[in-house]
Amino acid sequence: MNKYLFDHKIWSTPYYFYCEEDCHRLFLSFIEGRTFEKPTSNAEENVQETEAGESFTLNPGEDFQNCFPRQRIL
């Protein structure tokens, strides 16, 4: 609906509309190789120092890409 309104200049928006495959590809490019830290809160006072600040890196592998069966793997 929004795409139709945007294309016919009925509703202007700063957002770009991606097709399903482009959206998925863009999402994978955002998360690939990124390292994230596990959030800590002040309420977790009994957490050992080794547990706080745990980090992990996201690399979308075959299992993750299979969540999107219509997506072509590049």
From Swiss-Prot:
InterPro entries: DUP/COS. It is a peripheral membrane protein. One of its GO terms (cellular component) is cytoplasm. Pfam families: DUP. Keywords: Cytoplasm, Membrane. Its main location: cytoplasm. Disruption phenotype: Cells lacking all 10 proteins of the DUP240 multigene family show no obvious alterations in mating, sporulation and cell growth. It is found in: Cytoplasm; Membrane. Belongs to the DUP/COS family. This is DUP240 protein DFP2. The gene is DFP2.
